[in-house]
Amino acid sequence: MSELLLQGGRVLDKSGDRLADVLIDSQGRIAEIGKGLKGTETLDVQGKIISSGFVDLNAYLGGPEDQLSETITSGTESAVKGGYTAVVAISRDPVVVDNASSVKALMELSQEALCEIIVAGSATLHNDAGTMSPLGEISATGVRMFSAIGPPLTDFETTRRIMEYSQKYEITLLYSCSNSFLSSNGAMNEGSVSSQLGIPGIPTVAEEIEV
């Protein structure tokens, strides 16, 4: 059986960042990482990165009712080409995952995906900052992440309840923290580069003040 040698790539793993060869056995598993390795087939990957698959924590994928957005198929195809093996599907209008039925529908659509899709439910109904979604009902379907990506959660009582329920159901919250008054006109991080390009920047304090 043949062994594939990925020669001269940039290896990123828990050991660090280094140039090395990677030998893949006939079962498709990594057999060895090092210098000067031999294999029955060799692929020159100089200038390329070899690593575990990336995970996109903020992906927007449209459904059948949202034809203008990227579809499950096209979105995951782009992800795979970029080295991503999983994407977290964030809930946004008009595809809002704020009940068990919408979760199941998205999971069915995910069968068309070319990589793993991790469904993130909406922490609030209709992505409205004022009303908490049924976190228990949604988490019972297997969802372990919930996002608050819409309007800022200025209703602190709702925010408190969401955080308490997240502990009860052992779920992870994904917050988009940005003060709209400080970031409304910004298009990139505020700094020397934004000044040089003449592009309005978003100051770090816009996120810090929300946290």
What residues fall within each predicted segment?
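Short coil/turn connectors at secondary-structure junctions
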Residues: 1-2, 37-40, 46, 50, ...
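Short secondary-structure boundary/hinge segments and terminal tails
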Residues: 41, 96-98, 128, 156, ...
